[in-house]
């Protein structure tokens, strides 16, 4: 039973990383590119770094939302099926 719970915890961490990684990477890459652009042009405008990151994150969320939803629904179905095994 404990090994099954450990497998479940590991699967939870994997799914959490897989769902959050595209959004975080998009923000990271866009932030890095904007920072390099600001450093080379010596433009120090705060909104210049904030707005592209927000747009990139929203774009990635829109593109990956169906995949994220399917992954979460499959995981939820798996958890619901495992409830009797974990309890009993």
From Swiss-Prot:
GO CC field: bacterial-type flagellum basal body; plasma membrane
Location of the protein in the cell: Cell membrane; Bacterial flagellum basal body
Membrane topology, as annotated: Multi-pass membrane protein
Transmembrane segments: 17-37, 48-68
Domain of life of the organism encoding this protein: Bacteria
Protein keywords: Bacterial flagellum, Cell membrane, Membrane, Transmembrane, Transmembrane helix
GO biological process terms held by the UniProt record: bacterial-type flagellum assembly; protein secretion
Protein name per its UniProtKB record: Flagellar biosynthetic protein FliQ
Species of origin: Helicobacter pylori (strain ATCC 700392 / 26695)
Protein's gene: fliQ
């Amino acid at each position: 039973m404990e090994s099954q719970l450990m497998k479940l915890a590991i699967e939870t961490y994997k799914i959490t990383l897989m769902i959050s990684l595209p959004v975080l990477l998009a923000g990271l890459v866009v932030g890095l590119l904007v920072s390099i652009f600001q450093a080379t042009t010596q433009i120090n405008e705060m909104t210049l770094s904030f707005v592209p990151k927000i747009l990139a994150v929203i774009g990635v969320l829109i593109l990956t939302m169906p995949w994220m939803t399917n992954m979460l629904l499959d995981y939820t179905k798996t958890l619901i099926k495992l409830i009797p095994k974990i309890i009993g």
